[in-house]
Amino acid sequence: MESANASTSAQSIDQLCKECNIPMHNLQILCVFCRKTLSTAEVYSFAYKQLYVVYRGNFPFAACAICLELQGKVNQFRHFNYAGYAVTVEEETNKSILDVLIRCYLCHKPLCHVEKVRHILDKARFIKLQDTWKGRCFHCWTSCMETILP
């Protein structure tokens, strides 16, 4: 990251840019996993996905696209609890499926209402990883299905 104040308490890319007075397209931040500098597109993607900046030694880090997907797959294998339909999620959380924060288990983007409804209409299950419900966003759903279909 370029000339940023390491004492910031920013939790998001947007907050970090505001507190450090750096335009988002000029932000240089390292991936917490591989230590490579995120591209401008990855910085914007990280912000769009509403992911949190993490701190190591008072220095902010994000995660690149490749590491996010890899971590998603690792979490799926290591921390899978069980799968359930929307009804199961609603019963467990005592909330409407539309009010539950559900992220994509691959790219970690929060699912919108339409993506949650697609799970219901297609009778697709949500998965519970480490006590958190996950699903698939449209982008990851399509890329997942492309590998299955001829």
Swiss-Prot record:
Subunit notes for this chain? Forms homodimers. Interacts with ubiquitin-protein ligase UBE3A/E6-AP; this interaction stimulates UBE3A ubiquitin activity. Interacts with host TP53 and EP300; this interaction inhibits TP53 activity.
Gene field: E6
Question: Which species expresses this protein natively?
Answer: Human papillomavirus 44
Q: Where are the zinc fingers (unnamed)?
A: 31-67, 104-140
Is the keyword RNA-binding in the record? no
Cited function: This protein may be involved in the oncogenic potential of this virus (cervical neoplasia-associated virus). Plays a major role in the induction and maintenance of cellular transformation. E6 associates with host UBE3A/E6-AP ubiquitin-protein ligase and modulates its activity. Sequesters tumor suppressor TP53 in the host cytoplasm and modulates its activity by interacting with host EP300 that results in the reduction of TP53 acetylation and activation. In turn, apoptosis induced by DNA damage is inhibited. E6 also protects host keratinocytes from apoptosis by mediating the degradation of host BAK1. May also inhibit host immune response.
Q: Which GO terms describe its biological process?
A: DNA-templated transcription; regulation of DNA-templated transcription; symbiont-mediated perturbation of host apoptosis; symbiont-mediated perturbation of host ubiquitin-like protein modification; symbiont-mediated suppression of host innate immune response; symbiont-mediated suppression of host type I interferon-mediated signaling pathway
Where primarily located?
host cell
Protein's name in the database: Protein E6
Miscellaneous note, as given in the UniProt record, is: Belongs to the low risk human alphapapillomavirus family. The cancer-causing human papillomavirus E6 protein has a unique carboxy terminal PDZ domain containing substrate but low risk E6s do not possess this domain.
